[in-house]
Amino acid sequence: MGIAFRLRQLRWGRTAATRVERFETIHWDTPDFRLASWDAGLRYRRGRGWRVTLTDWPEGPGCRRTYVDLEGGPSSPPAEALRLLSPYLRYAEVGQVARLRHLETGRQFGELWAIHQVVSLLVERHAVAHARRVSLRSHGPLTGTRPALAALRKAGVVDTTELPLLAELLGPEAAPRWRGTPLDRDSSVAQAVTAALRDNAARLVRNEAIVLEGSDPEGVHQARVACRRYRSALQTFAPVLEPAWTAELRDELGTLGTDLGAVRDTEVLLTRLRASAAARGVEGEATERLLSRLVGERVLARDVLISVVESHEHGELLQRLLAAASHPALLPETAGQPASDVLLPLMGASWRKLARRAHRLDDHPGDVDLHQLRIAAKKCRYAVLALVPLLGDGPARIAARLGTLQDTLGDQHDAVVAGNWLQEAVGRATDPEIAFAAGVLYGVERERADAGREAWREPWAALARKKGWGWM
């Protein structure tokens, strides 16, 4: 994690510095700075090899980065680096774009490090431009920052900046181009729809890079969420989009979502059953033997997903999704209209579908009915989230309530899925210990599924109250 700052003058003094480093880096990118446009990076540092930088969606001044260090000489990037960066590069060739000289001094504030950087752009070994920064960094979540921020401001830090070093040194051509687009109440339909689709397309690409890196299972989850949100946005905005264009994109996103879901669903089930087994004291070895089949299914599903994501056809799909997000096929008669006038009724339609489905449920709703209610809640939440950049806190509060309802229904659905899987496992088990473990866990999941049939009513009641809907 990190937060960057501009400096007026840093006054913590040499004796306070606990670390001093001098080094040079060679940065690689495409001629149109495709990596920089995504806040990603590829650099070589003599003596330390190659570093790949992947970032998730920037939220405010901080962003979460994943670094992958690879061995190799300076003449060309390792194949693994290009593989990890393929969602950004989409087969474009990379070359050297900048040589930088770094002078870094660091001071520790508890678990955090404040790094003062003086970075120079070198042309034929001569410094032609300079940038000065302080980065507040942590190896884990960026917490406990208040004392460090106070000390930094006292030392001369003046304000935050989200402009990366390469953009500051090389100019706007190296600036990020896939960040959030600001909207307000006066934004047009074209601006709002484009911003929503770009947001989801960008989240998909960023998280596909995390999927390829492989160490964080959250990458698959977030890529799937981005895929679903993109697809849901196309459905929500369908009345203002060309029908054939929308249908084709939704079909392609549906296929990708299936591949992502095959991995994510097995990961969720594994995590859930292991946690239930630990909570009930089920013997660990028996649990792992029970779950070995599921582990194998996850490995197979991930292998299939990776082969899809690395394919040339998928690279072409990403290009189409990004192009479609940047230039959606809007109906000419609606594109210039005020977004709030047009999109609010579309969100209202999604809400009415959810409300009708909820009101149709009797006192003993079935699992399938609750699953359909969860899907409706999810679609409504995505529609409301599209209004947050336009209307602010009102839709955000409703989206949070919808999220609570969705999570409650999601837990009930996960319990049903887990129970069904365990029931099959009991039927095929020949080992008594495995059968016993499966039976115990089946009982746990059926209890949770039964409880979930009533648990959703409380968040639904909170959501259905008129309070909080004044922005409509």
Set out the residue ranges of the language-model regions.
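Function-determining surface determinants
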Residues: 1-472
